[in-house]
Amino acid sequence: MSMKKILFNGLGNRGWIGGLYYLKNIIFSCLQSEEITKKYRIVVLIDPEHADIFTCFGNRIDLRIYDGTNKVKLALYEMNLIWLHGVKYCYALELNRIGSLFASRGIFWIPDFQHKTLPEFFKPEELARKDVTDRRMTELSNPLVLSSEDAKNDLERFYPEHQCKVQLIHFVSYIEPELRAITPKLEHEVAEKFGLQRKYTYLPNQFWKHKNHVVAVKAIELLKKQGLLADYDFVFTGNLKDYRNPEYIDELKKIMEAQPVAGSIKLLGFVERTEQLCIMKNAAFIVQPSLCEGWGTVLEDAKVLDKAVLLSDIPVHREQKNEKCVLFDPHDPKALAQLLVETAEKADMPEHTAYFAGDMEKGIANMYREAEAYARGLENIFV
């Protein structure tokens, strides 16, 4: 008898790379569980452009590559795949027209409740659509995966009458294949390509307003006006776009492109994943100023690289942080500026070189331990 299957449909997340990385990370945890792998075969449905995210799993999963641009053909393909090929569960199922047909097989996932905690960052029609989608998931008796206690608290606050079976499952960032590909030659090439010859701190988020780059940019402006950290660059990656809040991007650009800030900021745009991790690996330290996260992938990346992180003081970060994280008020540029100076001074001390370089092998070993522990929560759903 053929094995039952768990379907991870990545076609719905094509416009959100973080959602695809999340699926990859959950699959990694599933593969650490003998209880899951002996009962189920994991199937990933993905488009050709993003298939390489999942090829690292080799023959441990079935990769179904499908273009998906023709919605009618995609619907027929999905129905055929689920009905005729033994799919028992659909992980992170979306309750769209097709997904609703398979609601009984759905494992739902809500990344966070940002539209409830920061509604001012959304357009009214997007708020309404998001609330309808989330409410439908909470009203069904299916398992609902949340990534943090903070998200669970938000669920209880905003949807107190929910009927879903809540499963709290953290995730690690499975980046070992990318890290193993980083060689001294690649590090040199990346430094040359992006002009990273000086010491730098790194901010790796896309420029959504809730990522709160503005506090970092204003902190850098304060430093430069005082002539501090003259030997440091500040490196940003991610698309400088937020369709919800274009005026926010204009505000950031106005500061970033003016002196004395402009000469110290490097806006690299969207970079390939291995290059991005190479940049993180060689940063003096990381800054993560976000106002909202479900369970932050940036922080999980930094943990695997064993990097020091200046981290916004929000509930989920208090839950997620490790001993190499220092919290700061995400609304106080002056406090962050002072912390940047203190951390840079410490990073420049020879006795702290190893601490700030990070121990990648230690981080990878810890990633495996945590993934195995998180797999227990997935077993509660599938086994």
What feature does the model see in each segment?
Residues 1-383:
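Carbohydrate transferase catalytic cores enriched for Leloir-type hexosyltransferases
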